[in-house]
Amino acid sequence: MAKKVVGQIKLQIPAGKATPAPPVGPALGQHGVNIMGFCKEFNAKTADQAGMIIPVIISVYQDRSYTFITKTPPAAILIKKAAGIDKASGEPHTKKVATISKAKVKEIAELKMPDLNASSVESAMSMIAGTARSMGVVVED
């Protein structure tokens, strides 16, 4: 018989830097999960992606065991890294903060492809370009 899922927790944690401190500790603690065990596993799995924020979905089962799935970093973080900026524009329609090339957008789209509900790289590119526009980043040909 399959184990019964009693909770799903979605977090965004810096790669390789999960600690029992908030937000990780309280989110896992209320479901009775072994917090240190999760932190060690997550840090080991994401050690090669240092500096990125990794979304993770943790499924907690009735016997307090858990499984987790890591996703690709959010598009906004990848765009900021590609453009070399710390912060997106507060007024994206009037203030443009950076420009990125179409090649960079394609690179990000290919990286994000497993997590996007896009059928082709072109449609994924338009999603990434839309995110860039809403951040005040210009996409040039």
UniProtKB/Swiss-Prot annotation:
GO biological process, one term: translation
Keyword rRNA processing assigned: no
Keywords: Methylation, Ribonucleoprotein, Ribosomal protein, RNA-binding, rRNA-binding
Post-translational modification: One or more lysine residues are methylated.
Record-linked Pfam families: Ribosomal_L11, Ribosomal_L11_N
CC per GO annotation: cytosolic large ribosomal subunit
Protein's UniProt keywords contain Ribonucleoprotein: yes
Domain of life: Bacteria
Gene Ontology molecular-function annotations: large ribosomal subunit rRNA binding; structural constituent of ribosome
Annotated SUPFAM superfamilies: Ribosomal L11/L12e N-terminal domain, Ribosomal protein L11, C-terminal domain
CDD domains: Ribosomal_L11
Family: Belongs to the universal ribosomal protein uL11 family.
Subunit structure: Part of the ribosomal stalk of the 50S ribosomal subunit. Interacts with L10 and the large rRNA to form the base of the stalk. L10 forms an elongated spine to which L12 dimers bind in a sequential fashion forming a multimeric L10(L12)X complex.
Function: Forms part of the ribosomal stalk which helps the ribosome interact with GTP-bound translation factors.
Name of this protein: Large ribosomal subunit protein uL11
Organism of derivation: Alkaliphilus metalliredigens (strain QYMF)
